[in-house]
């Protein structure tokens, strides 16, 4: 099977930067992101080869700890945060791809998903910034 026949879903992909190397290599990359696509109601195609998932990290990020004493910004809404995470996991399990990755900054999401298998900083891969990511 050629790369052009391999579907890569970029769930919550934003600008598509994460999936761009696959696009450059000729894969059929589909960026499933708002406002065009809502991952919570997205129905994936058949024969998905790989999935990159990057659900919103707002409710799980340790960076939000600095707002702990703010009357509104410090409150976490884990139910809302888990909506995208659950949608991504549903698509992953529905598609049963050859590979999949769910990315989120190191933080509180591990309470629901367990210990991460891999952590990194973007600078490990030549990017000019640090963001401890799992």
Named regions from a protein language model:
Residues 16:
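Glycine-rich SAM-binding Motif I of class I
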């Amino acid at each position: 099977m050629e790369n052009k026949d391999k579907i890569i879903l970029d769930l919550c992909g934003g600008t598509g930067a994460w999936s761009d190397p696959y696009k450059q290599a000729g894969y059929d990359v589909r960026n499933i992101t708002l406002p065009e696509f809502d991952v919570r109601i997205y129905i994936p195609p058949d024969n998905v080869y790989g999935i990159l998932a990057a659900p919103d990290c707002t409710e799980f990020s340790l960076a939000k700890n600095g707002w702990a004493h703010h009357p509104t910004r410090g409150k976490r809404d884990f139910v809302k945060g888990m909506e995208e995470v659950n949608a991504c996991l549903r698509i992953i399990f529905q598609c049963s791809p050859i590979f999949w990755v769910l990315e989120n900054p190191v933080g509180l999401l591990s309470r629901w998903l367990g210990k991460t298998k891999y952590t990194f900083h973007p600078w490990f891969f030549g990017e000019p910034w640090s963001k401890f990511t799992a």
